[in-house]
């Protein structure tokens, strides 16, 4: 007799019609909170409404309901993303010079916006080449479209309409999965199933379908474009997909179909799945055949990864078991209990995801210029600078967000009674040692990194160049970085025998790729100047980490306020009668961390902008002589603070300051306006609440005199609200100022 284990019952994972659909809620602002729903007595009401509208934790303590709201909101977010994408593609279809750019990407600039003449704004429509007048864009969309095989504005139209359909679909899904079929909590907590689906589905099949698109559509179309064939003559994407003979003309192995795959004769496919390294000399981008190969390989990895976790079949990893077993000799209980944390606290989960995604975004920023993935991206200096800056800012914000949600987790979701001697508990128990050591590191880095600059400024002022730290006097070469560069340069034929060139031209070697007389990429030399500024990077990053980590580790308690957890994530002070306890909440640490994040990223993007203009970007003559935009002045000028002020900020601001009366004048106005927004922030940051309350009361008195006083009492912003408004305008003003400064400069000279 065979004894079988009983078949697992099929679990019903959704509730039907849990929340009725009604528009009545929309007419009641603050319906999620009893106090706010009563309506405004004072102007504080509108601030509380904004602060709490998306704080689902404060609406209910039911984890299932919170999870459903987050899940539904994600579909809304996706809908907005599709809507935005549709707008980008529609602009490409309706207002752009894409087809002209496609025919001559080296002499024609990308533009997808033509300004209407109302009171003279048409001055902004600059001549981007090919007889087209419009605003030069630096988003990189044209390069992506070419890489994906889009050859006409009609195709952009169709894609834009497709994205709108998807936006509507996402909007519907958000409604459906909250009001009609809402998942149960168990579904949100089914980690193994989620991993399998996300790894195999999103990343595995996603990469596989992109690889398929690249092989069947992008590669043949780009091969024709590179050979100078008129885009109108090139067969349409569906013709390549449906007609194998067309592909076989370009890649003969296509005639054999899938036979080489099943007979393990994979080298047959080396025509379109390559491992070359380096850049395509025609377009200055990575070889598209390398990119297709990469996506195929990634797809295989993720498809395997998506079959590793135990679900309905009793085979595979259990995440809980992995975490429970994760104990080292010095880590006590290790990761015991982490599984419960990550399945019951979405803040903890989000914190990890933000930290990893933020780091990844910064990695993307560094790869976009060193391994430019799209055709003609590397020679479009404005786009290169924009993409680097954009990804650095986004990465910085995501990492601060990681600290914010880690602190919210500590305050709202951490239960000290059930956590003993696991890794988190052990970190919390020696937090004083961590923070004081980190503080020492920050002081060391700060004094030494700035000390090197100040030494140079002093020696320069005294006329003693021989006593400066520079490549021509006292050298401080970044020997470790140079060793890494050299190792990568020598890799082809040695540690990477299959590759014909190293992963990036920036590592070294004699290669230079120029397209249409412009430098795409060349080896980037590192010297004393880079050594100095890298230590400023180390300093600013460590200070950011110090502030954020202190906020997380002291979110629940500190010697100053032992019961901090009871006060919540954000509070102004520990009540009246306890002086010196203001601005210690976890929220305030995020607030301060944002300023240092801004410092960190600013130094990075300034370094990048100047270094590339000095040592990489420029033109190449017929004799092969390279002339860089700023003539290689980085190595000698950036080693003093005065050099940064004079030869970078001041010298390169001339384009934005003198932009009036030209097509770049919008950047001049933005530069001015964003400085104003930034200065406006200081009013909120340097002034106390009482000052404004007194002022408001005089103004209210005047209104009462004239019998025009409003029913809703005006109130000064609370301390936290004032700081929030301040930091928002500080960052917005600073980022927009930098944006105007960079773009006016690089569009004028690049």
From Swiss-Prot:
InterPro entries attached to this UniProt entry: PSI_PsaA, PSI_PsaA/B, PSI_PsaA/B_CS, PSI_PsaA/B_sf
Binding sites annotated in the UniProt record for [4Fe-4S] cluster: 573, 582
Keyword Glycoprotein: no
Bilayer-spanning residue ranges: 70-93, 156-179, 195-219, 291-309, 346-369, 385-411, 433-455, 531-549, 589-610, 664-686, 724-744
Residues of the signal peptide: none
Annotated binding of chlorophyll a', by residue: 675
Residue sites binding phylloquinone per the record: 692
Keyword field: 4Fe-4S, Chlorophyll, Chloroplast, Chromophore, Electron transport, Iron, Iron-sulfur, Magnesium, Membrane, Metal-binding, Oxidoreductase, Photosynthesis, Photosystem I, Plastid, Thylakoid, Transmembrane, Transmembrane helix, Transport
Any one annotated GO CC term: chloroplast thylakoid membrane
EC number(s) stated in the UniProt entry for this protein: 1.97.1.12
Family stated for the protein in its record: Belongs to the PsaA/PsaB family.
Oligomeric and partner information: The PsaA/B heterodimer binds the P700 chlorophyll special pair and subsequent electron acceptors. PSI consists of a core antenna complex that captures photons, and an electron transfer chain that converts photonic excitation into a charge separation. The eukaryotic PSI reaction center is composed of at least 11 subunits.
Protein name, per record: Photosystem I P700 chlorophyll a apoprotein A1
